[in-house]
Amino acid sequence: VLKMLPFDNKSEFQVVVEMPAGTPLENTASTLHELGALLAKQPEVLNLQAYAGTASPITFNGLVRQYYLRSDAEQGDLQVALVDKHQRSEKSHAIAQRLRPELEKIGLKHNARVKVVEVPPGPPVMSPLVAEVYGPDEAGRQELAMRLSKAFDETPDIVGVDTSIKENAPRAFLRVRHQRAES
């Protein structure tokens, strides 16, 4: 793995949650609550805030990653503040790395994708690794994107694999029979 900048020792990190399309807000909030309960037990965690179905306050990192656009019921995140770096034995990266598997396990139980997002040591980027797929038709682009996603998933040290392919939310259409409804 090529690394351009060393890991920093920041005072915070973020847990970004993507539930399946169409998930009710209450389910997203419940998942965030369970993730938050795990984090609250950690001695390095000073406090945390949860945001379900609404964007968290804009940070420089979030601005570049467009987290301010996250407003769907199936989207949530946790802003996690750590105790001062002089009052903890582990650096923020080590803490995030240690907690990631436990957080992902909770996410899996709720059918959620969970990403632990650290504040970068340098200028923020969309993601540490980005692959853009171009092609003449949507179906071909999506098929190639899914193959790339699978390859990334199977590569050691690549975590938080995601695509920008939007999942179709289930829909229900109701046809009101006005005559019956009035009676």
What feature does the model see in each segment?
Residues 63-64, 125-134, 175-179:
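Short, low-order "capping/linker" segments at domain edges
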Residues 16, 49-51, 115-117, 164, ...:
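Solvent-exposed beta-strand sheet faces enriched in polar/charged residues
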Residues 10-14, 43-47, 73-77, 109-111, ...:
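Extracytoplasmic
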